[in-house]
Amino acid sequence: MGERARSPDIEQGKKGGKHPYSHYSSDLGSSPQSSGPSSPVNTTPCASTREKNPKRHLSDNQVHHPTVRKVSPKAVPSKKGIRVGFRSQSLNREPLRKDPDIVTKRVLSARLLKINELQNEVSELQVKLAQLLKENKALKSLQYRQEKALNKFEDAENEISQLIHRHNNEITALKERLRKSQEKERATEKRVKETEGELFRTKFSLQKLKKISEARHLPERDDLAKKLVSAELKLDDTERKIKELSKNLELSTNSFQRQLLAERKRAFEAYDENKVLQKELQRLHHKLKEKEKELDIKNIYANRLPKSSPKKEKEIERKHVSCQSDFTDQCTKGVQTAEDFELEDFPFTAQTVLCYENRWDEPEYLSSYLEYQDLNKHGSEMLSSVLGQEGKYDEDEDPCSAKQEARKPESEWAREELDKVKGKSALLGRAEKLALEAGRFPTENYQAQSVDKFEDEAERLKTEMLLAKLNEINKELQDPQNLGRAPLPLLPNFESKLHSPDRSTRPYSFPESLDRSFNGQHLQDLSFLTPRGEGGSPGPIRSPGQIRSPAPLDEFSFGSYVPSFGKTLGKSNPPSQKSSLLDFQSNSSESPSKDSLDLMSRKEKKATLMEQLFGPSASNTSVSSKSTDPHFPAASRGDMDPLHFLSGDRNSRVREPGDEEEDLFLREGRSFNPNRHRLKHASNKPTVTAVDSVDEDIEEVTLR
């Protein structure tokens, strides 16, 4: 196609080229230079403009190209005819034109070549344009198809969420349908089971009815109905009883719980109160120890030791043999099991109190240790006043025998009262016994106010009795001729006052505890088992007959002052004490030769009184001088004798009462606690020992 378009142009150029040549040739002579250079100048801008604006040139070619291709064939002959006519005219006009020069030809040929080249380029560009148009059209169609597919894909992607939502809705609907179907299935299975159970029961009842219908030995229906009614009534009664019993059980359980709580509370309160009382007991024990120390310092009767005669010592040894059996009986009867006095693992310490002569004494006769301390100074003054008048008067032994006969009814009455007290104490429970043994009086009597009142009143009574007795002694000393009247009892009787209504509930009552507490574990001294001598001193051990017959009450009614003799504390020189003691004994031994027998009997009465007031140690000053008297009252009574338990080889040396008591510990008291805190006498002690200690002048009993 391009070749076809190119060929007419070439042909046209060739034809046109002939005419210009002819035209140029005709005008060559007139304007050869102007025409020559003008043509290249005109062609050059065209080429340059085409190169600068190829797009515009292409568009122009695209516009004018169809017109060139569609030139009718009729136009060609017209042009040819015109050209021919022009040619013919030029030939006719210039028949004799000269040939152009060579330069012009060359320029023209160059212009022609250039035109041909440009035409070739135009044709090539047109071909390329046609190809590009085809390609553009194909790309547009492809783009359209791609856009259509893309729109279709986007629509499908937007529908995915809706599709998922619809799918979820379908799943929910299917699950709901499945649940309903399962419920229906379960309901159906339940109905089937109920139906099967009903069928089974129906079959069972049918079989039972068949058996009943076949049974011939059954009673009538009315009897069976009555039995059924009675069985139902019994069942109802049984159920009602069960309910009542369960209710009663619940109520009883609640009441028992309340009672148990109350008992526990009471037990805790008792436990706390017991602890308080134990602390108070310890405090009193420490206070008592302090009082003992003070008494040890204030002792004033350490060196007044008499020397007993050999005849008296033999008599004491003979009585000691008879006392050993009774002492063994007391030890046997006084044993107390550990179960009776073990109280809450509390280690009770031994409490030091004054006890009376023997186990037949009334519990009211027990007095506290504090009374002794209060009356210590007063008793020492009375002792000095009585000893100053000791050698002036004398008295026969008849009043003493009359005095003993007057005291027998009182002793029997005391035994009856003691039996009553023992009978009452036997009825006490174990807890009350423990309370009586531990505190010696009920818990409420531990109050300080009542105890102080009782102690004050007891002190006042003791003082009155002591003053009355001293006045009586002074009267007897001033009136030695008045010997026929009956003597006063050595001490006033406390019985009526202690048994008065205001004294009926007083403490200090433990008649059995004295016998039971002698188990060898908490014993601190022997004298609480040894029946007292007169005056509440560490008295001698009586013979069995004397122990079974209680001593007169007046002999041991004064139990607050108990002087005795212990071991020396190193306050004085032992040799000087020995010499002074020997001098004192020699003077006392010479007294029978200087005084008459009446004076000896009166001195014996004084010694008995001093023994009652201050213990046997006070009256021992005249024992050695009067031991030869066969009618000696003290020998008949035997109250002071057991203090001088001397062996056969010790008759020649002087022994003090503390030594005799210590020997008694060594011989008879092997069951005692070996860890006693009392001072022991060595086996090789000197012949005469003067002591200042008061460790032995207080009788101790363990308060359990």
From Swiss-Prot:
GO terms for molecular function: protein-containing complex binding. The modification Phosphoserine is found at S7, S48. The keyword Flavoprotein does not apply. Residues 105-300, 448-479 form a coiled coil. Disruption phenotype: Deficient mice exhibit retinal patches of depigmentation, lack rod and cone ERG responses to light stimuli, and show loss of ciliary intraflagellar transport function in photoreceptors leading to failure of outer segment formation and photoreceptor degeneration. The keyword Magnesium does not apply. Keywords: Cell projection, Cilium, Coiled coil, Cytoplasm, Cytoskeleton, Phosphoprotein, Protein transport, Transport. Signal peptide: none annotated. Its main location: cytoplasm. Residues 1-14, 49-63, 404-417, 496-505, 592-608 have a biased composition (Basic and acidic residues). Detected in several tissues. It comes from the Eukaryota. InterPro entries: Lebercilin-like, Lebercilin_dom. It is found in: Cytoplasm, Cytoskeleton; Cytoplasm, Cytoskeleton, Cilium axoneme; Cytoplasm, Cytoskeleton, Cilium basal body; Cell projection, Cilium. One of its GO terms (cellular component) is axoneme. Residues 25-40, 617-627 have a biased composition (Low complexity). Transmembrane segments: none annotated. It holds the Pfam family Lebercilin. GO terms for biological process: intraciliary transport; photoreceptor cell maintenance; protein transport. Involved in intraflagellar protein (IFT) transport in photoreceptor cilia. Belongs to the LCA5 family. Interacts with NINL. Interacts with OFD1. Interacts with FAM161A. Interacts with components of the IFT complex B. PANTHER family: C21ORF13-RELATED, LEBERCILIN. This is Lebercilin. It comes from Mus musculus (Mouse). The gene is Lca5.
